[in-house]
Structure formats: structure tokens, C-alpha cells
Swiss-Prot record:
Residue ranges of every copy of the TCTP domain listed in the record: 1-166
Database matches in Pfam families: TCTP (PF00838)
Protein name: Translationally-controlled tumor protein homolog
PROSITE patterns given in the database record: TCTP_1, TCTP_3
Organism name: Schistosoma mansoni (Blood fluke)
Similarity section: Belongs to the TCTP family.
Underlying gene: TCTP
Length: 166
């Protein structure tokens, strides 16, 4: 299994089990799904027998909630952004990525700038459709992960900077 981590914070962002797709050479798009989680303990796991103990009516779980699996599994934290503050963060983050690429693969930098500008123009044109997340330590220098929905309106997908991952 390949684990993709934020290059700055070392936070686990996703694994190859999520089937990442490379988009515009410099991004991964990762589909996710909604799931229901509960904080209740299933009594059957500790040997309880609800039907034998008269508890068959206790199947109602009012502590369950619907979550996006990638957000829940990795402890992503929702981050509020307006367009201006997101652009400011993006510029600082890209500076970090470009500095890293200058050392490892300088020929890639012009293409990165070009592709990121094209992709991010689309993001900024549709800014209100995106949600923003970061890993649990809330490091202000960390990658901000974008989340939107596929055309079906039900499938959440996340956008990661490929060169921001290790």
C-alpha cells in the first residue's frame, strides 16, 4: 500500500486504495464517499445478546452521523477561506513547492506554473463550490485540500498537489 503524506506536516492524506487519478500532470483527484459512523459500542462485539436480553427495540442509534470517509479517516479539519485568503495561502504554498522542485527537478518548474495557473483559474471561477480541508495539526503552512462534488452531485472528490506529497 502506498501512503501519500503532506510534504510539510507528514500528515497522511490518502492511500492508493482510494485510486488517485493524475489531473493536469500536477494534481491528484481522489474520489471519496459518504459513510455513517457511530460512537456507540455494538454490544454484540462484547458478547451481549440484545434479543435474549429484551433489547431488540434498542437498535435506534441517535449518535450516528454521516461523514465523508476520507475526512473522517484522516482527521481532516474544515478550514474557512474567502477567495482572497485562499489565493494568499496558495501563493505561499506554491512558493514552497517551487523551491523544492528547483532542487529536485528544475526543468519541471515552468510546466508546474503553467498547469497550476490553468487548474486554479477553474477553481477560483467556481470558488463557492469548493470546501477546504487540512490535516489535524492545523499547520498554517500545510497543504490545503480542495473538496468538490462530481457531476452526479453525490460523489465528493478531493484535489491534492502531487508535488506537495511524499
Amino acid at each position: 500500500m502506498i501512503v501519500y503524506k503532506d510534504m510539510i506536516t507528514e500528515d497522511e492524506m490518502f492511500t492508493d486504495s482510494h485510486c488517485p487519478r493524475v489531473v493536469a500532470d500536477f494534481f491528484y483527484e481522489v474520489d471519496s464517499r459518504f459513510t455513517t459512523v457511530s460512537s456507540n459500542v455494538d454490544g454484540r462485539l462484547i458478547g451481549a445478546n440484545p434479543s435474549g436480553e429484551g433489547g431488540e427495540d434498542e437498535n435506534v442509534d441517535d449518535t450516528s452521523k454521516r461523514v465523508i470517509d476520507l475526512v473522517h479517516a484522516n482527521g481532516f479539519i474544515s478550514v474557512p477561506f474567502d477567495q482572497k485568503s485562499y489565493k494568499a495561502h496558495l501563493n505561499l504554498y506554491l512558493k514552497t513547492i517551487i523551491e523544492r522542485l528547483q532542487k529536485t527537478d528544475p526543468d519541471k518548474v515552468p510546466l508546474l506554473k503553467s498547469q497550476v495557473n490553468k487548474y486554479m483559474k477553474n477553481v477560483l471561477d467556481n470558488f463557492d463550490q469548493y470546501e477546504f480541508y487540512m490535516g489535524p495539526p492545523s499547520n498554517p503552512d500545510a497543504m490545503i485540500v480542495l473538496m468538490n462534488f462530481r457531476e452526479d452531485g453525490m460523489t465528493p472528490y478531493f484535489v491534492f498537489f502531487k508535488d506537495g506529497l511524499t
